[in-house]
Amino acid sequence: MEFKKYILKKFDYNVNVSNKKFYTPDETIKQKLEINVKFLKDRKNMLLTFKIDMIDNDDINILNLKVKYILTLNNEALDISESFIKKILSKFYPIFSKFILNFYNSIGLNNIQLPEF
């Protein structure tokens, strides 16, 4: 099953501005990815929520990010299984990834890759 369109519904982030630390490229920055999928009543639209928490080696919070999309499928989903959801997410994740990497670069978090899906 393919998706027809997607709409960015919400983009919210919080950067820890009290953290004055300068990060070097050899430091490890950990990211925790959480994905929530909810099918809407018509079973053709789904709400995707991505959350990313970024912390440094000292467990200091660097960034919290929450992005919500409405994803419209070509057809109504008849069988909503874990494998079906993974298939849809694997097709959408590159779009999400490109958007977030551009955001990371715009706020100076260059060369940071997203966690694997």
Where are these regions (language model features)?
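N-terminal intrinsically disordered, cationic/polar leader segments
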Residues: 1-91, 98-117
